[in-house]
Amino acid sequence: MTDFKPTAVPLIACDPFFSVWAFENELTADHTRHWTGNRHSLFGLLFIDGVPFRFLGKACLSSDGRYFPELPALEQVALEVTPTASVYTFRHEACTLKVTFLTPLLPHRLEVMSRPVSYVFYEITPAEEGHTFSVRFDACCELAGDLCGKAHRIAEQDGHAIVGRDEQNVLNRSGDDHRIDWGYLHLVHPSARVELDLHRRFFYTEGRWKDKKKIADEFDASHGDVLPADQVPVLAADSDKLSDCFVIAYDDVKSIMYYHKPMDAYYKKFYGDFDTMLAVAVNEAEALREECAAFDKQKKKKMEKVSSEYAQVGALAF
């Protein structure tokens, strides 16, 4: 790893509410958090020949960690922060895993910059033949609420998993130490679904995932069920590809109160509504990745004319 160790690393950096960071040097050393310090849990596992290893966050959502011990973590060997992405590299004797958290903040393309959408790309490079690999990624309902202990409405549709507060009071608060408490978190992937924190716990204690049919008996996300406050939904997806992308987005319904008038997000000027915008954002994932890489390279080249240290700090500040 390089000597450059940011105080916190941006993972999702769309706006002050849709904002998730890694506060520790290693991505598996702690839960991911909102910039205010409150837990906003993203979680990731890499399965190598069926054996799970953590590469992102922690699984246990209890306050004291008593429910179960954490699974072994992959060795983190590199971190690079660019103007639009944070790239982590992990190593195992069977493979190398690269995970890219991309928020396409392209100032010359406001229709893209204003989208409340981030991408989690991963690439697995096998060290030898004969191994199987799969990846699990999930996002907790904490990203859709200020504090825990409230009922949530969930939904699944066309490769989308969705969660938000059952009671929607849009733009109900302001100030520094607040998280969003309205709107809906979306996870987009062909396998995207709604699960519960209990299912994570079941896997950790039983060594296997709960049967999907049994999960379906617990709630019906396809019809927009409401889960009581004592249940903690997570949006989950998995993939057995060597490279793939999970898209995570936030529909805040209204974005700002302007002279007592709730105003739409800027992206709606271009797309009309959230669903149209999200469909475009999903389709453009790979193209945006390439465009952001070119943008980052150009910015880095300019900043390195001052110094390499300036380029590192400048990329983080962007």
Locate predicted features:
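Acidic/polar, glycine-enriched structural segments that form the non-catalytic walls/loops
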Residues: 1-7, 106-112, 127-318
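An extended acidic
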Residues: 9, 14-93, 185-203
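Residues that flank catalytic or metal-binding motifs in active/ligand-binding sites
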Residues: 13, 84, 116-118, 131, ...
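Short amphipathic beta-strand/extended segments with alternating polar/hydrophobic composition
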Residues: 53-59, 98-102, 136, 165, ...
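Extended, loop-rich substrate-binding clefts of extracytoplasmic carbohydrate-active enzymes
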Residues: 62-115, 205-229, 315
